């Protein structure tokens, strides 16, 4: 069983009468890329701020690297974060921005800035002032700043928001490189499930401050994969029939639907087997679901802002 690097228990944040985060209990394994999905205003940033120590919970608990309570302030030195945009000095170069952060944290050493710039793909930027960077370059420099001190957990708040396709790809490649080459655990938020599905190993879906679901990438792909959708009155009666046919990959979705993820071409034979068992089938079809459609269905539809 994988080691849990971060857990929250009933984490809550209240602003006056508004509950921005409502009893969120999330679980992040060591070495994971955890995609934190939700619309704008769902509570993502507030949750990340509490985890990073930038805001205090109204209630609930955070456990980080096995520590909680008063020990959190000490252990948060192992957390790097980029929340609500990087704080950059536009007239300075990338190297000088990094040098200032290194000296502030007392981790300055010769060649360290160049090493960090190489990690995020900015090794060749030279002395160009940061104000002349593209938004994608600024985001990658923000990630480099978050890496100062060599954290074990990297927290990124909407790092691809507003980027063009090239910028998104560059940030995505940087995240994958950090995870694969340095075994860094990464908590990354976004409102774009399609993009996070290209890198995430696990997901938490938040809506109106409530964590609706946690699932692995494999579980998400299965939910959205091509399947045979069978509509009938009593799905539980159909289970023995599928067992006799040797069908193993199926899900009783609700009181009227079964999803079958194998032997999709045998729908006619399956329909006949159900009929022989006295189970009337009201509908049977091959279907699949787009990732964004699944997200919108889970959060009640509407436009994903």
Regions flagged by a language model, labelled:
Residues 30, 106, 124, 234, ...:
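Non-catalytic surface loops within mature trypsin-like serine protease
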Residues 76, 98-99, 114-117, 169, ...:
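Generic structural signal for individual residues within well-ordered alpha-helical segments
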Residues 226-298, 305:
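Short, charged/small-residue-rich alpha-helical element at the C-terminal edge
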Residues 4-6, 13-188, 193-207, 211-213:
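ABC transporter nucleotide-binding domains
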Residues 172-261:
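ABC transporter nucleotide-binding domain
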Residues 1-12, 301-305:
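ABC-family P-loop ATPase nucleotide-binding domain
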Residues 9-11, 24, 250, 284:
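Generic beta-strand hydrophobic packing signal
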């Amino acid at each position: 069983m994988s080691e849990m690097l971060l857990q929250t228990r009933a984490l809550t944040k209240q602003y006056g009468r508004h509950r921005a985060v409502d009893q969120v209990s999330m679980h992040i394994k060591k070495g994971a890329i955890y995609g934190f999905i939700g619309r704008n205003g769902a509570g993502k940033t507030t949750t990340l701020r509490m985890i990073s120590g930038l805001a205090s919970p109204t209630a609930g608990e955070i456990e980080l690297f096995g520590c909680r309570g008063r020990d959190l302030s000490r252990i948060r030195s192992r957390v790097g974060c980029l929340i609500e945009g990087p704080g950059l000095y536009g007239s300075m170069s990338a190297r000088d921005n990094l040098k200032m952060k290194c000296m502030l944290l007392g981790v300055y050493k010769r060649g360290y800035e160049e090493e960090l710039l190489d990690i995020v793909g900015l090794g060749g930027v030279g002395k160009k002032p940061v104000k002349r960077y593209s938004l994608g370059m600024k985001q990658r420099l923000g990630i480099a700043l978050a890496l100062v001190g060599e954290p074990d957990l990297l927290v990124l708040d909407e790092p691809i928001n507003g980027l063009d396709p090239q910028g998104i790809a560059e940030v995505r490649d940087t995240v994958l490189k950090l995870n694969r080459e340095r075994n860094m655990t990464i908590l990354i938020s976004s409102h774009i499930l399609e993009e996070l599905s290209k890198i995430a190993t696990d997901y938490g879906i938040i809506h109106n401050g409530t964590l609706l679901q946690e699932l692995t990438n494999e579980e998400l792909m299965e939910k959205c994969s091509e399947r045979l959708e069978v509509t009938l009155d009593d799905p539980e009666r159909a289970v023995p029939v599928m067992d006799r046919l040797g069908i193993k990959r199926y899900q009783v979705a609700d009181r009227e639907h079964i999803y079958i993820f194998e032997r999709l071409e045998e729908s006619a034979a399956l329909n006949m087997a159900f009929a022989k068992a006295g189970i009337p089938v009201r509908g049977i079809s091959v279907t699949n679901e787009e990732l964004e459609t699944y997200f919108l269905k889970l959060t009640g539809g509407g436009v994903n802002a």
